[in-house]
Amino acid sequence: MSKLLVIALLLLPLINHGIYLATAWDDQDFFKYCPPSKCSQHGPMIRYPLCLESSNTSSSSSCGCAGRSIWKLACSGQDTILVHPVLGPYSVSAIDYRRSSMKITPLVDPCLVLQQKLIISRSSSSPQVDVINDEKPSFDENFFESSSATIVHCSREFTPAAAHADSIAGPVSCLSNTTHFFYLVNSDEDMSILPLDCKVVPVSDRGGISLPHMLKDQMFYNFTETAKKIPSFAETAVSWDEGDCRECELSGRRCAFSSQRDREFCMPDPHGSHIKVIAATSSVAAFVALLLTVATVLYLSLKTRYNAEIHMKVEMFLKTYGTSKPTRYTFSEVKKMARRFKEKVGQGGFGSVYKGELPNGVPVAVKMLENSTGEGESFINEVATIGLIHHANIVRLLGFCSEGMRRALIYEFMPNESLEKYIFSDDSNIFQNLLVPEKLLDIALGIARGMEYLHQGCNQRILHFDIKPHNILLDYNFNPKISDFGLAKLCARDQSIVTLTAARGTMGYIAPELYSRNFGGVSYKADVYSFGMLVLEMVSGRRNSDPRIGSQDDVYLPEWIYEKVINGEELALTLETTQEEKDKVRQLAMVALWCIQWNPRNRPSMTKVVNMLTGRLQSLQMPPKPFVSSENELMS
């Protein structure tokens, strides 16, 4: 809360200042008669002590633009122009009134302008500079910070002595040639420092060329640096004579001019009814900004604390987990392993999956947990459930990374991706050629054996809660492997019912009891239901919500398959099937219909499912309708 108090104290002056502006000035408004102006919508604002060239003489006089040492700017189309009598026109891109400076860029090469004005007499070796009034007198040399430069013509090149190196610049490359060498010399210097063959080039009616002081990081260049930069074709900053306006502008007010008193004065910026509205608005905006700042700081503080708690929870788990396999990697190792995450091969519920390679050349899949929820639960679930088990039908976890809030899981790579790719493919040839009845049975049996191991073969029972085609990966030989244990839950092997705070899984595969306890308690039978829905999709090649089933758009997939089986109709999608293949598909469908019984007590265990699929049960009875019979049974 101390941080919030500091921020509030910092913003309170802003609010007070807005209130002050709304009431501080109720006098004749200078800006009402001398409003700021622009040459274009995005051009710099032009206001006192600068003036825009205007034909309105009376307005110029009352606004302090007539007969005073100020810069007068002009508009040329959309550009704001400042004209130098010798160096030519400049475009003004920005004006900073608080620092009394502006950024200017030559519209034409200053050196070229100077060349055109430099007249070398054919009969004399003494050049002259013609600066007779061929430009508008918009550049008052008494107004800006400047140095006077004298143009010097020499018959040979020379190097200034070290004591005078800051006062002599040249030779100016764009003016000089093999017989004429031109230098710019600070007019404050005695010309006796020059070689005898050097002559001053006369400038009409002037003692020299006025070079505006160039700024860099609010520091003035010295004479030599300025003289070298002036001929360059680049944007630069120049400063004008500050006078009394600088202190006024720095205090947050505006410099103005009183025509009656013929002097400058300082006033709020601006004032009157218009500023009252602006000030009131700014006060409200400042208050809103304060609230947003407080809310942001509070959010970031809570988020930081939340992330720290998650990090501590994960680290405590990993400390308890020990140093046994899988291997823990640093994030830099994971990034190198995944080739900087260039090859994305999939997207899961908790993050993206990238193809990578271990240092020994073994291909791997790297899952970056981007949307991990439940206080790091998905990461902990994955490591805790499959980190120490090894089964032919469960994807193997080879390593992991937990570094700050960045977490990754490294699995064995499955080249044939997920089962979903094949059973829902728009290319019917894929389904017909790869997922023939024999292969369908092998895949279903492999999944069933993997689930049986999770439910019965480990020290603790592992409930997956997200069995679906997307989470069944296929290896080189199309052997299935169960993956994605982000929603998994561990429980004792003798624990029949587990407690959940919310339903888990994917719509279409979630058992009824996860939605309503009227169907019974949540147990490993929820996974059996998901397996049944998966197998129904395998034998039909369609999603359980696919409207293309049958002739009616609203036919429920289990109901459609049940009617097919009970009426002895074919389910296989291959063009030609033997009677044996038809029987295998029918067997798969009957097992699936047993698995999706609404009453969990009527569903078989995965051990019994394996026996059903292997034919160990001699007579497989037709199950009751899972969507009618079970409901009636539960209601009776």
Swiss-Prot record:
It is a single-pass type I membrane protein. Glycans are attached at residues 56, 177, 222. The active site is at 466 (proton acceptor). Keywords: ATP-binding, Cell membrane, Glycoprotein, Kinase, Membrane, Nucleotide-binding, Receptor, Serine/threonine-protein kinase, Signal, Transferase, Transmembrane, Transmembrane helix. It is found in: Cell membrane. Specifically expressed in the aerial parts of the plant. It is an enzyme of class 2 (transferase). Pfam families: PK_Tyr_Ser-Thr. It catalyses: L-seryl-[protein] + ATP = O-phospho-L-seryl-[protein] + ADP + H(+); L-threonyl-[protein] + ATP = O-phospho-L-threonyl-[protein] + ADP + H(+). Coiled coil: none annotated. Residues 25-276 are extracellular. Residues 1-24 form the signal peptide. Its EC number is 2.7.11.1. GO terms for molecular function: ATP binding; protein serine kinase activity; protein serine/threonine kinase activity. The chain crosses the membrane at residues 277-297. Residues 298-636 are cytoplasmic. One of its GO terms (cellular component) is plasma membrane. Belongs to the protein kinase superfamily. Ser/Thr protein kinase family. PANTHER family: RUST RESISTANCE KINASE LR10-RELATED. This is Rust resistance kinase Lr10. It comes from Triticum aestivum (Wheat).
